[in-house]
Amino acid sequence: HFQNYSSTKEGSLYSISLWGNRIPKGVNKDFVLSTTKSEVSFFSQNISISKGQGNTRNRTGSFSTSFGSKNLFTYPHETGNTMLFPLLILLLFTFFIGFIGIPFDNRTMDNGIVRLTILSKWLIPSINFTQESSNFSINSYEFITNAISSVSLAILGLFIAYIFYGSAYSFFQNLDLQNSFYKGSPKKNFFYQVKKKIYSWSYNRGYIDIFYSR
């Protein structure tokens, strides 16, 4: 039997976050994008074993894995396939309906009764590409300008959401975008306050839960 057995374990470097995942302690969670190198050690223990008198062995057993990557911060859990597939199906229908250009105000009179004829001409596109007139060029220019403005706003929203909730392996993590905004005291910084408001609004689902909790 071993005598004078003693072992010490290193303290845990992780804590439980609001999202149910482990995050490193002592790290400011507001700075989602960080460029600090780190190594992750699953456990490490120092064991001092003594046999009899004058026969002492010191053994250190450790099992560590070095990822050689940057600190991985937790993010909100992404939606699963249960939500993804219905959204993709809805996207396909929306795309083709918008491309075809169904005239929803197309109505006919039948004995004084207004009848909708949406599906009667649903294969007729809203833009006739074989038409050669000045009106066609004007309509095309207006369509392109409106499409560029709306798509640009959508891309801007996706870009902002990707910075806040994107993957830890994203390219923007190397740019250190968020930390560049928080120079000096973060609580007095304008960008810090804006980020805090947006995060609070999205975390509380646009404060809709307040009405349900009443």
UniProtKB/Swiss-Prot annotation:
GO terms for molecular function: NADH dehydrogenase (ubiquinone) activity; quinone binding. Keywords: Chloroplast, Membrane, NAD, NADP, Plastid, Plastoquinone, Quinone, Thylakoid, Translocase, Transmembrane, Transmembrane helix, Transport. InterPro entries: NADH_UbQ_OxRdtase_chlpt_su5_C (IPR002128), NU5C-like (IPR003945). The keyword GTP-binding does not apply. One of its GO terms (cellular component) is chloroplast thylakoid membrane. It is a multi-pass membrane protein. It comes from the Eukaryota. It is found in: Plastid, Chloroplast thylakoid membrane. NDH is composed of at least 16 different subunits, 5 of which are encoded in the nucleus. This is NAD(P)H-quinone oxidoreductase subunit 5, chloroplastic. It comes from Brachypodium sylvaticum (False brome).
